Design a protein with these regions (language model features):
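N-terminal intrinsically disordered, cationic/polar leader segments
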Residues: 1-91, 98, 105-131
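Aromatic (phenylalanine/tyrosine) cluster motif
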Residues: 130-131, 135-140
């Protein structure tokens, strides 16, 4: 199953400007990634939502980010399973990652990298054609 096309539907973020703190290379930045996948009725199109919460050493919010896509597959998905979802995500994650890394660089978080989305899977919930994947990503040390 291949991704035929994708459209960026929404890019929303909130930066904690009240913090007024500059981050140094030896600080740990923690990221929490949530992924929501919902297949539409035709089972060929899907909504894909990524949510990232970024926290500093003191568990103070640095950034909240929500990115929504609509993906169109080349064929109708016949068997929507956890392994199928992970396969689609593994193909799409590099596209998402490139967008986010460019965004991070534009707001001054030049050395923060996104870990691979399967780093430490916390849980998967399935509701018919709707999956919610939560991942607690490894803390990333700025360097």
């Amino acid at each position: 199953m291949e991704i035929k096309k994708y459209i960026l539907k929404k890019f929303d973020y909130d930066v904690n400007v009240s913090n007024k703190k500059f981050y140094t290379p030896n600080e740990t930045i923690k990221q929490k990634l949530g992924i929501n996948v919902k297949f539409l009725e035709d089972r060929k199109n899907m909504n894909l939502t990524f949510k990232i919460d970024m926290l500093d050493n003191d568990n103070i919010d640095i950034l909240k980010l929500k990115v929504e896509y609509i993906l169109t597959l080349n064929n109708e998905a016949l068997d929507i399973s956890e392994s199928f979802i992970k396969k689609i995500l593994s193909k799409f994650y590099p596209i998402f990652s490139k967008l986010i890394l460019n965004f991070y660089n534009s707001i001054g978080l030049n050395n923060v990298q996104l870990p691979e989305f399967w780093a430490k899977e916390k849980g998967i919930q399935k509701m018919d054609t709707f999956f919610t994947l939560l991942y607690y990503l490894f803390p990333y040390i700025l360097s």
